[in-house]
Amino acid sequence: MSQRDFYEILGIAKNTDVKQIKKAYKRLAMKHHPDRVKDNKELAEKKFKEIQKAYAILSDTQKRQAYDQFGHAGINGNAGATSGTSFSSSGFGDIFGDIFGGGSQQSNNRGSDLRYDLEIDLKEAAQGTTVKIRIPKNETCDTCSGTGAKPGTSVKTCLTCGGAGQIQIQQGFFAVQRPCNACSGTGQRIESTCNNCHGKGVVHKQKTLSVKIPAGVDTGNRIRLSGEGEAGIRGGLSGDLYVQIHVKKHAIFERQDSDLYCEVPIDFATAVLGGQVEVPTLDNKLNIKVPAGTQTGKLFRLRSKGITHLQHGGSGDVICKVKLETPINLSKKQQDLLQKFSNSCGKKHHPESNSFFGKMKSFFE
């Protein structure tokens, strides 16, 4: 059964940024939320779930990339994605906190996500590697264990919001919740602040992490390290670290998906008579047999010598394109010998030239 395009469901273009995707989702969620639709709630619930699913995919960079490349198959397990993707309304707490009020205190205290740009070479991208990175980030304060309070003192519940971290404001027919100004949304009041973190609950540090790079990554891929972002405020969850991959340009190979292309020069004699030619791979050098009469542009394929497929294992190929190198700086003797050789050749030695000039002659007649 055919499935609707996610971009069509949200009414957005394929190049829409994340901010506009969220905006479109909010607008549609307000319109089709079952609690706001009086008639045909069953249809409204179906429509709302469809909108939820579209937003869950398009708001996630990795899922969106898989969907853009493979369509619905990319997020249904056919292209290496996890099979049976589930969609729960609990994943939309931040947005519904904005629309209908609410949102957990723990969510408000969550640490920020971080990004680290990592440059690797083509061989590391092809075969996978593990690298160590050093990042500056906020870590939970060891002195106060993240409470922000001076050791030996206690953290008090905010009297304004009763520890909820939010206050409710009536706006017309709607009751809207907003972060409490008295405690900055934490639900707590500190009487004596920690001398180490000055009441923040976090301190700035440098942290070294080992990042496993899977074989087959390419520029634009990113790796998520859960909980390795900024520390949460006063018991809040830590954010995530996103490692953005950049693959350096190679001196010999040009990458196309999982295949590697290179151009291999061969001399005139080898092209005419045939012979062995040494060609590169990412690991070593190999010899290929060039048959007599090889023309420039002929492709030779070295199977499974390319890049590991990121999604389903196996490897691509190395494809060598031979290029006939015309000799230069010839001596007078060499030129004479070459001219004699040319004079000795007949039409049967140059079938493509004869065919071309024959067609050209008939064209002008």
From Swiss-Prot:
Binds 2 Zn(2+) ions per monomer. InterPro entries: DnaJ (IPR012724), DnaJ_C (IPR002939), DnaJ_domain (IPR001623), DnaJ_domain_CS (IPR018253), HSP40/DnaJ_pept-bd (IPR008971), HSP_DnaJ_Cys-rich_dom (IPR001305), HSP_DnaJ_Cys-rich_dom_sf (IPR036410), J_dom_sf (IPR036869). CXXCXGXG motif repeats lie at residues 141-148, 158-165, 180-187, 194-201. Homodimer. Its main location: cytoplasm. Belongs to the DnaJ family. This is Chaperone protein DnaJ. The J domain is necessary and sufficient to stimulate DnaK ATPase activity. Zinc center 1 plays an important role in the autonomous, DnaK-independent chaperone activity of DnaJ. Zinc center 2 is essential for interaction with DnaK and for DnaJ activity. Keywords: Chaperone, Cytoplasm, DNA replication, Metal-binding, Repeat, Stress response, Zinc, Zinc-finger. Transmembrane segments: none annotated. GO terms for molecular function: ATP binding; heat shock protein binding; unfolded protein binding; zinc ion binding. It holds the Pfam family DnaJ_C.
